[in-house]
């Protein structure tokens, strides 16, 4: 009789799905790497094909999720002007696409020029202006996405949705996703969450979830120790040490491996 596989061991079906996803990601990367067409000709196709890669619904013709969403800017002098969001999903994101020219050397080395970075910063400011111009009834989306088609995707988040500044997500060092990084399942999962549940990426919610899980584990540990005959006072002292140790690890007070 064949021994059962340990829990968590991938099944042949799981492996096949993973292989298919990896193959699809590599095909997407190859398809879009260094694409030279104009912004208008490529931005919508890029979004549609990215949606297919991530397994999410592409934009529709409905105003809550569409390409070229009309926006009206209200100016201080009472005048108005019109704009259009490249791609908009209510409660999820404002998406601004560009087609810049990072240069051949930048493409090879993965570096970018100041002019390229400045252009993306300008695109970010444009996207934030769109987010602030949305009707109050719709609220502001938690994410602003800035894309240089065929090169990078930048994520900026403002989870309070109160009009505060959108900041690099998850941090200034890794908010820029290069096209080749779409081969990473974790990166694809992050992008997928923009469509399915953007607020699930809120660090405060993740921390609260972890805190609740830890509290539940410690409560069960306390019950088991007391059930085993340990007095409440030593149990409480032990759990306090556990909490302090976790805190010390989180803030870097404990030495890491090899130090």
Locate the predicted segments by residue.
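Active-site metal-binding core of divalent-cation-utilizing nuclease and nuclease-like domains
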Residues: 57-91
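Acidic-basic catalytic patches of nuclease active cores, encompassing PD-(D/E)XK
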Residues: 29-69
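Short, solvent-exposed loop/edge-beta patches enriched in aromatic
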Residues: 52-59, 89-90, 135-139
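Solvent-exposed, flexible loop/coil residues
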Residues: 60, 71, 173, 181-183, ...
């Amino acid at each position: 009789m064949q021994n059962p596989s340990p829990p968590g061991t991938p099944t042949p079906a799981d492996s096949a799905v993973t292989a298919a996803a990896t193959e699809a990601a590599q095909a997407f990367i190859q398809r879009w790497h260094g694409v030279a067409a104009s912004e208008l000709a490529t931005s919508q196709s890029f979004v549609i094909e990215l949606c297919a890669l991530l397994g999410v619904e592409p934009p529709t013709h409905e105003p809550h999720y569409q390409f070229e969403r009309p926006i009206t800017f209200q100016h201080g002098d009472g005048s108005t002007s019109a704009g259009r969001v490249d791609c908009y999903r209510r409660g999820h994101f404002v998406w601004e696409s560009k087609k810049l020219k990072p240069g051949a050397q930048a493409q090879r080395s993965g570096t970018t020029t100041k002019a390229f970075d400045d252009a993306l910063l300008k695109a970010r400011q444009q996207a934030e202006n769109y987010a602030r111009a949305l009707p109050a009834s719709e609220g502001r989306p938690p994410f602003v996405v800035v894309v240089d088609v065929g090169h990078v995707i930048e994520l900026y988040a403002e989870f309070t949705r109160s009009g505060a500044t959108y900041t690099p997500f998850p941090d200034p060092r890794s908010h820029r996703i290069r096209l080749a990084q779409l081969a990473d399942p974790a990166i694809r999962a992050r992008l997928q969450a923009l469509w399915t549940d953007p607020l699930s990426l809120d660090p405060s919610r993740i921390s609260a979830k972890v805190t609740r899980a830890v509290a539940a584990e410690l409560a069960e540990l306390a019950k088991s120790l007391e059930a085993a005959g340990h007095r409440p006072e030593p149990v409480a002292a032990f759990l306090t040490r556990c909490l302090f140790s976790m805190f010390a690890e989180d803030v870097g007070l404990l030495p890491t491996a090899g130090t």
